[in-house]
C-alpha cells in the first residue's frame, strides 16, 4: 500500500494579502487563532513552538498597536524578536528597501514582518529574502492580519460569518483594512456593504462584489456588523471632506444612526479611533462595541499566522507555495 503524503494545513510561505488565500486557508488560520486565545488567557503565556526562530519587525510607518501585537505574538510563541527602528536606520541615510532586505536576509531571520507606505512593498521584499514575510500593511493595498482578526472577532460573537450583513463605513478610498476585509468577508459568504461619501470611494467598487451606499441610514439598515474606518487625513493631499464636523454629522457613528442596524449589531473599529470624527464615544464604549476584543484577537491571529508559516508540524515544507 502506497503511503500518501498529508498536505500541510497552511501551504503558503508568506502572508502578503487575503487575495490568493482560499476559504480553507482562511478557516485554517481562524481555527488555529481560536486555540491561541487560550494561551494568551492563561497565567503562563508561553509556547515553545518557535523557540530558536528569529522574527524581525520592520516598520516604515509608525504603528504602536500592530507592532506591539506582532512583538507579543512572537514572544508568546517562543521566538527571538527584534524590532528594527527605521527612524535610526540606514534607510534614513538613503538605503533602499531592497538594500535593507538584503542586509537583513544575511542575518538569517526566519520571518520578516513589514509595514510600508508603498503598495506592493511586502511582495517585493518576499522576492528578495529567503525567509517568510508577513504583510503588516502596505499603503492602501492590504492589511491581511487585520481582516483575519476582524473575522475572528465576528465569528466568535456571531457563531459564523456566512450570510451576515457587514457594513464597512468611512474612508474606504485610503483604507487597506477595507480592501482586505472585503476580500475575506466575500470569501466566507458575508453580504458586504460599503458606506462612504463619493469622494472617499475608490473606483472599481462594483467589481469587488459589494453594495455601495452614500447614506449611513440606508447602508446600516439591518446590518449585523458595523465596521467603522479611520479618516486618514495624513494620506489626503486635497479636500476630500468639507470639515471634520460635517463628516461626523453625516458619516460618524452615533446612537441614532446605529438604531437602523440590527439590535444586536456589532460595532467595530480597527484603531486608532478619532472619537467624535468616525465614532461617538458612547458608541465606541457602548455594549455593542467589540473594539477591545479586536485588540485581543489581534495577538491570537498573529500568533496563528507565524505558527502556521514556521511550525514544521503544521507546514512541513515551511511553505514551498507563495
UniProtKB/Swiss-Prot annotation:
This protein's pathway: Pyrimidine metabolism; UMP biosynthesis via de novo pathway; (S)-dihydroorotate from bicarbonate: step 2/3
UniProt-listed Enzyme Commission number(s): 2.1.3.2
Residues involved in carbamoyl phosphate binding: 65-66, 115, 143, 146, 271-272
Residues that hold L-aspartate according to the record: 93, 176, 230
Molecular function terms from GO: amino acid binding; aspartate carbamoyltransferase activity
Top-rank EC class of the record's enzyme: transferase
Family matches, as InterPro entries: Asp/Orn_carbamoyltranf_P-bd, Asp/Orn_carbamoylTrfase, Asp/Orn_carbamoylTrfase_sf, Asp_carbamoyltransf, Asp_carbamoyltransf_Asp/Orn-bd
Alphabetized SUPFAM superfamilies for the sequence: Aspartate/ornithine carbamoyltransferase
Gene Ontology terms: cellular component: cytosol
Swiss-Prot/TrEMBL keywords: Pyrimidine biosynthesis, Transferase
Gene Ontology biological process: 'de novo' pyrimidine nucleobase biosynthetic process; 'de novo' UMP biosynthetic process; amino acid metabolic process
Protein function: Catalyzes the condensation of carbamoyl phosphate and aspartate to form carbamoyl aspartate and inorganic phosphate, the committed step in the de novo pyrimidine nucleotide biosynthesis pathway.
Quaternary structure (record): Heterododecamer (2C3:3R2) of six catalytic PyrB chains organized as two trimers (C3), and six regulatory PyrI chains organized as three dimers (R2).
Assigned protein family: Belongs to the aspartate/ornithine carbamoyltransferase superfamily. ATCase family.
Protein name: Aspartate carbamoyltransferase catalytic subunit
Primary gene name: pyrB
Amino acid at each position: 500500500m502506497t503511503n500518501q503524503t498529508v498536505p500541510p494545513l497552511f501551504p503558503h510561505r508568506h502572508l502578503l494579502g487575503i487575495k490568493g488565500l482560499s476559504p480553507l486557508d482562511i478557516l485554517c488560520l481562524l481555527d488555529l487563532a481560536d486555540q491561541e486565545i487560550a494561551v494568551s488567557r492563561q497565567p503562563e503565556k508561553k509556547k515553545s513552538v518557535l523557540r530558536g526562530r528569529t522574527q524581525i519587525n520592520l516598520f516604515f510607518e509608525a504603528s504602536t498597536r500592530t507592532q506591539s501585537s506582532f512583538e507579543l505574538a512572537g514572544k508568546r510563541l517562543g521566538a527571538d524578536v527584534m524590532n528594527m527602528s527605521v527612524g535610526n536606520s540606514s534607510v534614513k541615510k538613503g538605503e533602499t528597501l531592497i538594500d535593507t532586505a538584503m542586509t537583513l536576509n544575511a542575518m538569517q531571520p526566519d520571518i520578516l514582518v513589514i509595514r510600508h507606505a508603498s503598495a506592493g512593498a511586502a511582495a517585493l521584499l518576499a522576492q528578495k529574502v529567503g525567509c517568510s514575510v508577513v504583510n503588516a500593511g502596505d499603503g492602501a493595498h492590504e492589511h491581511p492580519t487585520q481582516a483575519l482578526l476582524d473575522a475572528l472577532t465576528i465569528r466568535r460573537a456571531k457563531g459564523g460569518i456566512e450570510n451576515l450583513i457587514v457594513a464597512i463605513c468611512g474612508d474606504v478610498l485610503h483604507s487597506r483594512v477595507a480592501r482586505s476585509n472585503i476580500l475575506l468577508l466575500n470569501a466566507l459568504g458575508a453580504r458586504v456593504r460599503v458606506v462612504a461619501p463619493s469622494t472617499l470611494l475608490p473606483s472599481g467598487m462594483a467589481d469587488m462584489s459589494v453594495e455601495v451606499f452614500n447614506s449611513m441610514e440606508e447602508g446600516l439598515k439591518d446590518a449585523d456588523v458595523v465596521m467603522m474606518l479611520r479618516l486618514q487625513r495624513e494620506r489626503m493631499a486635497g479636500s476630500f471632506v468639507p470639515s471634520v464636523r460635517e463628516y461626523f454629522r453625516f458619516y460618524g457613528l452615533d446612537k441614532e444612526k446605529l438604531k437602523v442596524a440590527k439590535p444586536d449589531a456589532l460595532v467595530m473599529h480597527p484603531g486608532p479611533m478619532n472619537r467624535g470624527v468616525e465614532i461617538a464615544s458612547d458608541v465606541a464604549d457602548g455594549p455593542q462595541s467589540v473594539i477591545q476584543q479586536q485588540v485581543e484577537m489581534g495577538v491570537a491571529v498573529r500568533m496563528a499566522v507565524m505558527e502556521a508559516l514556521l511550525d514544521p508540524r503544521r507546514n512541513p515544507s515551511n511553505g514551498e507555495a507563495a
